[in-house]
Amino acid sequence: DGSYTYAADQTAADNIAAGESQSDVFVYTMTDGTENVSANITITVLGANDNPSAQNDVGVINEGGTLTVQNGDNANVSGSYDANGENSGDVIDTTSSSHKDTDLDTSDTLSITKIKKSGGSDSNVSSGSSYNSSGTAVTGTYGTLTIGADGSYKYVAQSDIAGLNDGATVTDTFTYTLSDGTATTTADITITVIGGAASNNSPSAVNDTDAVNEDATITKTGAQDDVLNDDSDSDG
């Protein structure tokens, strides 16, 4: 009877940028029982802006160390760690298949626009910045993260984290906002800090005083009289 339906292929249509269009053409044949004639059905599919996709990032660092994550837009960077806890990679890596933030609209430019620590408020990230040039610094629980709009970042862990024993771990989490200029999405950067023997926290000693008569002997016993009673160590 000539009626028809058309369902766009979402996977193929995702590659059409906003403001652009592509056409699907179908040829049909009509007959009156004696003669046949052909004509076209042309469907124009209009592109729309697709949201960017942000991937969660993780890092591992020793207590008191520095984690530097470079921008990898011009190099294939996967995010490997060396023995010192330093990383090569970045939040926005358009070349690596194992670690990347993406946008189906290939003409869009991705950038980081906001950053915040877990439970904190957003701080704006300057356009065109990198971690070492006009980057935005956010102080977390166990260190400070500095991030740029290009996705590069640097995390410096505190050198004396109270209660962090050798081999024990704590995590600092930050949430970044990824923008393609129109739409935004968010993901996390989670840094694991490992306590080390070299960064063992020093104990705290408190001066003790007492009095004794001339030619007498003073003896202290029991928990209340122990000179260690008012001394402490944050490592437990």
Predicted regions and their residues:
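Acidic, turn/loop-rich segments in luminal/extracellular domains of secretory-pathway
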Residues: D1-N49, S126-A197
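Extracellular ectodomain surface segments
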Residues: S53-V138, S199-G236
